[in-house]
Structures are given as C-alpha cells and as structure tokens.
Amino acid sequence: YVLRSGTYAAVVGGVNVDIGGQSYAPLVARDSNPGRVRISLGGVGRNIAHNMSLLGVDVRLLTAFGDDLHAQRVAASCGELGIDISHALQVPGGTTSTYLFLNDVDGDMALGLSDMDICERITPAYLASNLSLLNNAQVIVADTNIPAESLQYLVTHCTPPVFVDPVSTAKARKVQPVL
C-alpha cells in the first residue's frame, strides 16, 4: 500500500463557458430572433470540482484554458470556490472551451455548437509534469473530454483510485480500453 501525503482530490477534465439562448417566439431562420441569453460556467471537470468543493473536499483541478476573458471568469470562480487551479495549463492565444446552444420557444434545443479543442492540450506529457501531484491525491476523478491517451496515462501511471465520468455515449468509448 502506498501512503499518500495529500488530503485532496485531483480532478482532470474540461472547463467550459456555456452560452445559451432561448427564443421568445418560433425561430425564424437567417434572422435575428428576440429572446434571452444566459452565460454560465460548466465543463464536466469543473462541475465535478465545484460539487466536491461544496462538499468540503480540497480539490486540485488539472485542466486547460485560454488567456481570454472566459479564462478570467473561470479562474475567479474557482478561486471563490476554493478550487486550486495553480497547476492548470493556460494556453497563450488559446480559446477557453465554449459551448453555445440555442433553444426554440418550447425549450427544445435547435442548435448546439461546441468549441472544446483546448481539451486536447491535457496530454500525457502535461499529466506527467504533474505526476507527483496526482499520485499524492487521495482520489483522481477524470472526464472523457480529455484525450484517450491521457486516460490511459492516468490508469497506468497513477496510484490513487481513478474514477471516470464518461460525459456522453460517444465519449464513453474512450473508457473501454482502460477498464
């Protein structure tokens, strides 16, 4: 049995800014539609870290975000929640993951657009540079927004228990090789 010095959980996954709109009337294609727009913070990894923090768990979030206004909002929120992002990867010139959706007047999604390319930066090399932090955690929780090779790295090189949130049916396929 390996004794771990940390009393924290490590979360590896995506942070997201969600921008959603809902039309007040039936949508008219190729036109400006009156409605309401809401912006919120999300991302499976960030949401897991957020909820663990609310439960009183000390959390280290390993993620990637850009150097844009969305990144500033994510960092401020994590600071307010006590989520440690000091080991997060900030990509100069990068765009923080953003999810944009539009709902029709009935609340059904008419369109969704996801820009999560920055999650590909959560590589085995990035994880290797944080291996001591990972191995001293009591538990590691990852999401499948990270590359499959990174999930494989966590399972192969990390000694704490690793739990994975599969995110979606399509992304759940990344988990099968490491079961």
Give, region by region, the residue ranges found by the protein language model.
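Glycine-rich phosphate/adenosyl-contacting loop at the front of the ribokinase-like
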Residues: Y1-L62, L69-I83
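Ribokinase/PfkB-type carbohydrate-kinase core domain
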Residues: Y1-V15, R60, S77-Q90, F101-L179
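Residues in the short beta-alpha loop(s) of Rossmann-like NAD(P)-binding domains
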Residues: F65-D68, S168
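Short, glycine-/polar-rich solvent-exposed loops and beta-turns at beta-strand/coil boundaries
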Residues: P92-G94
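Short alpha-helix plus adjacent loop in nuclease-associated cores
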Residues: T96-Y99
